Amino acid sequence: MKPGEIIVKKTEIEINKGTDDSETVITVKNIGDRPIQVGSHYHFFEANTGLKFDREKAYGKHLDIPAGAAVRFEPGDEKKVQLVEYNGRRRIYGFRGLVDGAIDEERVFRVENGHPNAGVKNDEGKQNANKESGDNR
């Protein structure tokens, strides 16, 4: 043994341990002209609008990759990604401001396909102000 040496067990590391077994695999395509990168803890539902995928399936989920990692989508890239549900209190704040509260199905509202302001209502049951103005933060 050398001074400062760290000896670790040679076992597999299980990521997202304790998450619900409802893993979701979706196909994502970058329809924009710039690369887009999505981090491990980002609410995938709120990912860049240059990514085309079934956003409803991504609601309340993040990428099933190690913490700190990310997936990069080059222009025109199409890949399958695996998503897992958030654990804990299941409240999401920030990102694009589409949720800003609990992620439960009762709060979800839907608008016409392709509408840029699709998201969820706030805790008071009102549409988030950013959706009324069209500002996606």
Swiss-Prot record:
GO terms for biological process: urea catabolic process. It is an enzyme of class 3 (hydrolase). It catalyses: urea + 2 H2O + H(+) = hydrogencarbonate + 2 NH4(+). Its EC number is 3.5.1.5. It is found in: Cytoplasm. GO terms for molecular function: urease activity. Pathway: Nitrogen metabolism; urea degradation; CO(2) and NH(3) from urea (urease route): step 1/1. CDD domains: Urease_beta. InterPro entries: Urease_beta-like, Urease_betasu_sf, Urease_subunit. Residues 113-137 are annotated as: Disordered. SUPFAM superfamilies: Urease, beta-subunit. Pfam families: Urease_beta. GO terms for cellular component: urease complex. Keywords: Cytoplasm, Hydrolase. Belongs to the urease beta subunit family. Heterotrimer of UreA (gamma), UreB (beta) and UreC (alpha) subunits. Three heterotrimers associate to form the active enzyme. This is Urease subunit beta. It comes from Staphylococcus carnosus (strain TM300).
